[in-house]
Amino acid sequence: MASSDKVPVACPASSGDGKEPMGNPTKTTTAMLEKGTAMMQSMKPIRQMSLHVCSFACYSHDPGRQIEVHIYGHRVNQDFLQCAVYDSNSSKAHLIGIEYIVSEKLFESLSPEEQKLWHSHDYEIQMALLVTPRVPELVAKPELKNLAKSYGKFWCTWQIDRGDKLPLGVPSLMVSPQDVNLGRIKPELVKKRDEEHGISTESLKPSRDGICGPEKKNLVADYWVRFRKGFALDVVETDMKRTAPFP
């Protein structure tokens, strides 16, 4: 059975550079039909997304594997955001996962077992690893201050860095950059991101002075930093619950 910390069984979808999904090019008739229906449909959930940040994430079971992520968020209320995660901000970006972000208050209401799955955001913001593309720091700073006190739970559904041409296997839990050996983002990844977006992480760092993390950093979050243990999912066969026998 599939596991998030094992390479999937070899197949056409598991070999390649992961840049282009498998499948034929979209037909002109299909594209025209979709444009027409998009004009008639509300797309309300998607139109609620008003936040875009770019950062990096590490695999919980293998922090040495690090990826650039673009997070598009919908603020449900002051304490909760729900986000779609992509591998870039281009029109051909891959949807690679989802992240939920909660305030310190909501996080502290969770059970310790649940808290193990969540990560903090203060370090990546203070180190300017998390940026708001095209938004001036002065405008972004109030939101960055809020995010620095928050916690996130990010499930990666498409391991593009592995070269997968389709989403394979089960989701992987992701963790945020941290000031420990395996949690420090590789310089070449930061350099590539900066060049693509015309920014300088080093130049942004001074503007992050005064941004603080949670009032009382929860020791269960960022579980791997303290306990040196990550989390991986396994798919296991199980008996189905049913109220009547199968025909």
Curated annotation (Swiss-Prot):
InterPro entries: OBAP-like (IPR010686). Pfam families: DUF1264. Residues 1-28 are annotated as: Disordered. Belongs to the OBAP family. This is Oil body-associated protein 2B. The lineage of its organism: Eukaryota, Viridiplantae, Streptophyta, Embryophyta, Tracheophyta.
